[in-house]
Amino acid sequence: MTRRILTVALVATTVGACRPLPPGVRAPTEIWAIWSPDSRGVSMPDGFAATAETWITIDTISFRPTIISRVADDGTSLGQQSAAGLVPARRASVITSFQGTRYHADVIRALSENADAVGVTAGAFASLLSSSRAQAVILDFQEMAAEDLEMLMDVSRAIADSSRAHSAAAIIMMIPAADSAAYPARTLGRVADLLLVKLFPEHGVTTPAGPIVSAAWFTRRLGQRASEAGVNRVVAGIPADGIIWDRRGARRISYLDAVRLAREASTPIIRDPASGNLHAVSSRDGWDIWLVDRELVEKLIDEGRRIGVTRFALFGLEGADPQLFEFVRRARSPKL
């Protein structure tokens, strides 16, 4: 029995075997990199336990898989050339209903109406994933409604079953933090090995300016989802960049661009004591910036660990505080 538990604890540090750990087994902290579809050409630091480097969408007409982004085109996993002796990052692929500028929930609905089409699409995804040597599959079907749950389950289950039949890839489902009606954790856990909970934005591009994610908001939402699914089956999604609100609207901004704008406006970037976010305002230039940095990410990971969650996924890394990557490298032991 002891040998079995030790084996599970060791293989669970890789995404290729990221099934939930048995109760009582304390895993080390895992930090994943969720690279955006527009991340091509960015510097790819080492230290991550897993990297989502390929994005595949469902074509709105044919329902066939279409690769919209592949960060690494040379066949290597990110982190493979680590000089620090870190274990190479396990690669994951994201299957998403996002295309253009929005999620297409209508594609999932239409696909679910034809069982044959679901089977063909699932098989096509499985073949593509097998050829890409993905060790994990992240299903990203956001902005569905509560009445769509059965359709969401049908499509997700078909893709998951087909993927498992073709490879040992783990299945992860990305879900929002707050919408338990459309994305009930216990139900979705019947399909997915892990649930990646996006714990942001508290304030985003569709809201007035404010903290992107505060520690209190993060802890409350993560605690709710962890209680639904179990701490061993949750991955906490954390933002790593910022948002600027100005006369043109709101959009994401990188840490370095935010620092540059603040310097040009002779405006200090201060830490908001209530949320822990960095904040800068320029009345002269008409913008308001809220920003995530290394210190905030460390705090959020500490809060998640107190709850019992051990897996964390960082989004928006192409715009992150450069010091964050040093934290990731130090957080991941070469002995894993």
Q: What is each residue range found by the language model?
A:
Residues 15-17:
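C-terminal motif of bacterial Sec signal peptides marking the signal peptidase cleavage site
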Residues 35-49, 114-130, 178-186, 292-303:
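Short, acidic/polar
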Residues 64-75, 150-262:
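Substrate-binding surface in catalytic domains of secreted glycosidases
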Residues 22-121:
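Glycan-recognition patch characteristic of GH18 chitinases/ENGases
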Residues 54, 139, 195, 236, ...:
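Conserved, mostly hydrophobic/aromatic
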Residues 99-103, 238-300:
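Glycan-binding loop/region signatures in secreted carbohydrate-active enzymes
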Residues 3-7:
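N-terminal export leaders
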Residues 121-151, 198-201, 313:
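Active-site groove signature of glycoside hydrolases
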